[in-house]
């Protein structure tokens, strides 16, 4: 079939298949993956689909079993996983866990050719600290956080924001392309995280804005689907409305249709907003809306909603009284 008559969906599927095929032209790589949560499990699965040999670790046995069923090798110790991997990708919840994981993983030494790739969302300062520690041991470390959520992880359409040298970026690009469609070199170590924190701050602000607007429209008598269609064909169009709408029934695949289960938890975006606030304070950058968004999501966590998807903020907006 000629490319010019392919539908957009068919063309995207074809291009993703081509990218994956090209990623293993030099031979399948041994890739370690630590952290098999909502994002990590899907990212790891796409590496297997691309033909790489996957080595995995997670504290959750069911998560490990799910990848083992697809062909991955499960390890009891991350240090052993790292010694058997050309690349090691980490996808973990916070600074403390990432820091401790790398200490454990590299305690017995590292292979000189291994490249460690952290795709968690952590502080730029921790990135720089880890890079120095691992470089001193003879290996390489870069930051490569992601955007695109669980749908992007499932479909291998994530955006990767890479911090490191140009040579390191080129060395990891083919591996990252197995999991994403946009791989951007943001600059030196920590710049990937700087981009990610700014993006997530904007995401939180936009989700609150969409939730406020949707709630106001519904209370005026507008149908939620009608108003969402208007937003998505007007100047208010954004990812939080078009792909991840917080109102149940508007976007079939959004967490709003599963009682806000799964997805990107309110606890995690609260953590990210805290990191963004720290970076803003250190650089003397005003973030009035970012600070307010942090308070809103901290309020959600205080109300016991930290495990719910961050779009649950709409559910709180529906209540007659809402306060931060």
Swiss-Prot record:
Transit peptide as recorded in UniProt: 1-25
Protein keywords: Branched-chain amino acid catabolism, Mitochondrion, NAD, Oxidoreductase, Transit peptide
Pathway recorded for this protein: Amino-acid degradation; L-valine degradation
Protein localization: Mitochondrion
Entry's transmembrane regions: none
Catalytic machinery residues: 196
Binding of NAD(+), residues: 29-58, 92-93, 121, 271
Keyword Oxidoreductase attached: yes
Highest taxon in the source lineage: Eukaryota
GO cellular component: a single term: mitochondrion
Catalytic activity: 3-hydroxy-2-methylpropanoate + NAD(+) = 2-methyl-3-oxopropanoate + NADH + H(+)
Pfam families in alphabetical order: NAD_binding_11 (PF14833), NAD_binding_2 (PF03446)
InterPro entries linked to this entry: 3-OH-isobutyrate_DH-rel_CS, 6-PGluconate_DH-like_C_sf, 6PGD_dom2, 6PGDH_NADP-bd, HIBADH, HIBADH-like_NADP-bd, HIBADH-related, NAD(P)-bd_dom_sf
Enzyme class: oxidoreductase
Keyword Oxidoreductase set for record: yes
MF-aspect GO terms: 3-hydroxyisobutyrate dehydrogenase activity; NAD binding; NADP binding
BP-aspect Gene Ontology terms: valine catabolic process
Annotated EC: 1.1.1.31
Family: Belongs to the HIBADH-related family. 3-hydroxyisobutyrate dehydrogenase subfamily.
PANTHER family xref list: 3-HYDROXYISOBUTYRATE DEHYDROGENASE, MITOCHONDRIAL (PTHR22981:SF7), 3-HYDROXYISOBUTYRATE DEHYDROGENASE-RELATED (PTHR22981)
Name of the protein described by the UniProt record: 3-hydroxyisobutyrate dehydrogenase, mitochondrial
Species of origin: Drosophila melanogaster (Fruit fly)
């Amino acid at each position: 079939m000629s490319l010019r008559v392919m539908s957009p969906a068919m063309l995207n599927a074809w291009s993703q298949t081509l990218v994956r095929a090209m990623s293993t032209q030099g031979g399948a790589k041994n890739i370690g993956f630590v952290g098999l949560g909502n994002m990590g499990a899907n990212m790891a699965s796409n590496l297997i689909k691309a033909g790489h040999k996957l080595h995995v670790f997670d504290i959750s046995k069911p998560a490990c079993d799910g990848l083992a069923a697809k062909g991955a090798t499960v390890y009891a110790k991350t240090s052993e996983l790292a010694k058997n991997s050309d690349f090691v990708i980490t996808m973990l919840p916070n600074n403390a866990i990432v820091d401790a994981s790398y200490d454990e993983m590299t305690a017995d030494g590292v292979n000189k050719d291994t490249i460690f790739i952290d795709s968690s969302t952590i502080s730029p300062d921790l990135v720089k600290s880890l890079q120095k520690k691992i470089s001193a041991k003879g290996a390489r470390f870069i930051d490569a956080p992601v955007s695109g959520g669980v749908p992007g992880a499932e479909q291998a359409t994530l955006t990767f924001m890479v911090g490191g040298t140009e040579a390191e970026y080129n060395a990891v690009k083919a591996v990252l392309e197995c999991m994403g469609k946009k791989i951007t070199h943001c600059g030196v170590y920590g710049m990937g995280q700087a981009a990610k924190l700014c993006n997530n701050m904007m995401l939180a602000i936009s989700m609150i804005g969409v939730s406020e607007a949707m709630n106001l429209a519904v209370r005026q008598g507008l149908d939620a689907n009608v108003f969402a269609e208007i937003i998505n064909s007007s100047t208010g169009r954004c990812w939080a409305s078009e792909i991840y709408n917080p109102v149940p029934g508007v976007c079939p695949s959004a967490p709003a249709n599963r009682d806000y289960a799964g997805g990107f938890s309110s606890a995690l975006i609260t953590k990210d907003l805290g990191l963004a606030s720290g970076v803003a304070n250190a650089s003397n950058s005003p973030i009035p809306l970012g600070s307010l968004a942090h308070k809103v999501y901290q309020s959600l966590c205080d109300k016991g909603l930290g495990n719910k998807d961050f779009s649950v903020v709409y559910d709180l907006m529906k209540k007659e009284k809402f306060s931060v």
